[in-house]
Design a protein with these regions (language model features):
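Histidine-centered active-site loop/cap adjacent to the catalytic His
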Residues: 348-377
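C-terminal hydrophobic structural anchor segments
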Residues: 304-331
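Generic structural signal for well-ordered alpha-helices
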Residues: 291-295, 325
Length: 377
């Protein structure tokens, strides 16, 4: 792994502007983030087009090129916890690369020993949730390489709101399928193997994952940020925490999904499992009212989308799913539906592994395809 320094200059309003210049222009070509032929997907902070910040899991940038035997990426990582890994798809081969340093530019070798006279496709994607974010400063290829128009995103669009299961946390610990999680520092986390991204691939759809490990619906519950931040106050943000958690807000006009999947209602049992303790009690009713209000806010942003309400196969008390079904019936929205997996709430005590996620994707994609003939219109 090559690591080089990056000149950094401060711009107005305290915004940090990064430009990578430490390379030999006689042998290396820099592909800037604003290059017309790059394809982006995901809830990415493009406030500075020359230095987009990858925040949400599954976000990616894709490039097609010829004339280079290798390709590298320049990133600047900000780590909150866990080790930091990026995901790579090189001509459809999927693997990971570790970011060894934080708060300084790092050059990551994404692929090498490529045939120069062949067109290659490279995708740099965010494997993990907001345990880290990174600034993308461009690709490096051999001098004389040609960038070609990248494969376009599918016409179909889907979006997921969820927690660690939706983000693909610990999905690569395949030897622990159906078991509690092994000790790890994030090396098993991979959004590519989440049921969410797998569902999108089965449907041949573009996907946005708005997901964070530990998050619940309501502020003051769940594990994320010690329970201070819930999805109800984060769903319209790019960043869920830190100095940028308030701004910039996400512009919903940038991505209009045909289908929205809401998979919240598992971490909500912490610090108290209110559905198990008293399903008809005041706290449980308050949760259902907050859930209903959240759905109304989603509907305001997506007036024509199908909204699928669900949880996952991660073990949890079934009262949460009954509450979701109750809200679904009460709102009387013909395009808001409730879905349960075959092993819903009882499939595993640990996070969902890749094989389990593939089964979930099979069930969910089949359900979505059966919603209506015009689901993708």
């Amino acid at each position: 792994m090559d690591e080089k320094n990056l000149p950094v200059k401060k711009a107005e309003k305290g915004i940090i502007m990064q430009r990578y210049t430490d390379y030999d222009e006689t042998t290396v070509r820099m592909i800037q983030p604003v290059h017309d032929e790059l394809t982006y997907c995901g809830r990415i902070d493009h406030s500075d087009p020359d230095a987009p910040v990858f925040v949400q899991p599954g976000s990616f940038v894709r490039m097609s090129f010829t004339g280079s035997s290798w390709v590298r990426a320049v990133v600047m990582n900000h780590r909150s916890y866990n080790d930091s890994w990026v995901g790579v798809l090189s001509d459809r081969n999927q693997y990971r690369v570790k970011i060894e340093k934080d708060e300084e530019p790092v050059v990551l070798t994404l692929a090498e020993n490529l045939e120069r006279d062949t067109t290659h496709e490279i995708t740099l994607f965010k494997r993990m949730d907001q345990c880290h974010t990174y600034v993308f400063l461009g690709f490096l290829v051999e001098y004389g390489a040609r960038v070609e128009k990248a494969r376009p995103l599918p016409r179909k669009k889907i979006e997921f709101y969820g927690d660690s299961v939706t983000a693909g946390e610990v999905s690569e610990a395949q030897n622990y399928a159906g078991m509690p999680d092994p000790p790890s520092e994030g090396e098993y986390n991979n959004a590519y193997f989440s049921y969410a991204w797998a569902t999108a691939r089965r449907l041949h759809a573009a996907v946005h994952l708005v997901a964070q490990g530990g998050i619940a619906l309501r502020d003051g519950t769940g594990y994320y940020e010690n329970g201070t931040r819930g999805m109800e106050s984060c769903f319209d943000r790019i960043y869920f925490s830190g100095e940028k958690s308030g701004e910039p807000r996400w512009n919903f006009a940038r991505y209009t999904p045909h289908v929205v999947v809401v998979a919240i209602g598992q971490n909500d049992a912490w610090p108290e499992d209110i559905m198990k303790n008293d399903y008809y009690g005041e706290q449980a009713q308050q949760w259902r009212e907050h859930y209903k209000a959240f759905l109304c806010r989603l509907r305001e942003n997506y007036p024509h989308a199908w909204i699928v309400l669900t949880t996952t196969i991660l073990n949890h008390y079934p009262g949460w799913d009954r509450s979701i079904g109750k809200v679904c019936a009460e709102i009387r929205d013909p395009k808001t539906v409730h879905f349960l997996y075959q092993e819903n709430g009882r499939g595993t005590p640990g996070h969902v592994r890749a094989s389990e996620a593939m089964q979930m994707a099979l069930e969910l994609s089949g359900f979505i395809e059966g919603l209506a003939p015009d689901v993708w219109d």
